Swiss-Prot record:
Part of the 50S ribosomal subunit. Contacts protein L29, and trigger factor when it is bound to the ribosome. InterPro entries: Nucleotide-bd_a/b_plait_sf, Ribosomal_uL23-like, Ribosomal_uL23/eL15/eS24_sf, Ribosomal_uL23_CS. SUPFAM superfamilies: Ribosomal proteins S24e, L23 and L15e. Belongs to the universal ribosomal protein uL23 family. This is Large ribosomal subunit protein uL23. It comes from Vibrio campbellii (strain ATCC BAA-1116). GO terms for biological process: translation.
């Protein structure tokens, strides 16, 4: 079983974009930025435990960081791993969670 500490380190932040919003509305899919070494099983367990929902599937991808320059200096942004988490029918994820 996955430890409580590991569950808290797997999910970094929700990924907010136009594509993520469309996926949430049409396919009941939520997009998260996750730890690079996180597995699909860990992501599923973390979402189910933290948000108390049932997960249907998890798809992951790694976006490569862009090369950026400022004058003569050149650097590179970090790679980011994203997880598309599809929830089962009738399940809804509320980020606010009862805040008033």
């Amino acid at each position: 079983m996955i430890t409580e500490e590991r569950i808290l380190k797997v999910l970094r932040a929700p990924h907010i974009s136009e594509k993520a919003t469309m996926a949430a509305e049409k396919a009941n899919t939520i997009v998260f930025k996750v730890a690079k070494d996180a597995t699909k099983k860990e992501i599923k367990a973390a979402v189910e435990k933290l948000f108390e929902v049932e997960v249907k599937s998890v798809n992951t991808l790694i976006t490569k960081g862009k090369t950026k320059r400022q004058g003569l200096r050149q650097g590179r942004r970090s790679d980011v791993k994203k997880a598309y988490v599809t929830l089962k029918e009738g399940q809804d994820l509320d980020f606010v969670g009862g805040a008033e």
